[in-house]
Design a protein with these regions (language model features):
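Generic detection of short hydrophobic beta-strand segments and adjacent strand-loop junctions
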Residues: 12-16, 55-56, 102
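Residues that cap or initiate secondary-structure elements
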Residues: 22, 36, 50-52, 83, ...
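Short, well-structured hydrophobic secondary-structure segments
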Residues: 25-70
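Generic recognition of long tandem-repeat/solenoid scaffolds
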Residues: 44, 89-93, 102
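Short, internal acidic amphipathic alpha-helical interface segments
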Residues: 52-96
Length: 141
């Protein structure tokens, strides 16, 4: 049986840039989060007027999106350059309520990922899942 992790969650505030409906640049703060108890996922919380918006994606998707286009459907990521020529990760989020395309500086995203890898290295995610608990949850419906 795998034992649940004892490491605390990793969180990091990362500024995101986007454009409003009139094409004006906007910057807002987002929280990127990682819980070793859910080792395959990262969580993004967009702190925007009207309330926080939460998204989850695979940690491997975020890592891939730093270097090459990744994802399909609800979340797509790709490396890009901002208007000042700085490396960014572009992220395109689709939901029934709308679409949001944002950019985060690559160095910020990489710093966050490096902190998650220090807690649970890539490829070691399965070691951090309590399989008995997972089966119990699935059977409980």
């Amino acid at each position: 049986m795998s034992q649940p992790p004892t490491a605390p969650p990793v969180t990091q505030e990362i500024p995101l840039q986007c454009e409003d409906e009139l094409g004006r640049p906007l910057t807002f703060v987002s929280s990127f989060g990682y819980d070793p108890g859910d080792p395959y996922a990262v969580w993004l919380t967009f702190h925007i007027p009207g309330g926080d918006v939460h998204w989850a994606m695979a940690r491997s998707l975020l890592a891939t999106g730093i270097d090459e286009p990744a994802g399909e459907g609800d979340i797509c990521l790709w490396p890009n350059l901002d208007s000042d020529g700085r490396a960014v990760v572009s992220m395109d989020f689709h939901s029934p309520e709308g679409r949001l395309v944002v950019e985060a500086r690559t160095r910020d995203v990489y710093q966050f990922l490096a902190r998650t890898w220090a807690v649970v290295p890539p490829g070691a995610e399965a070691d951090n899942v309590d399989l008995d608990e997972l089966v119990d949850e699935l059977l409980a419906g």
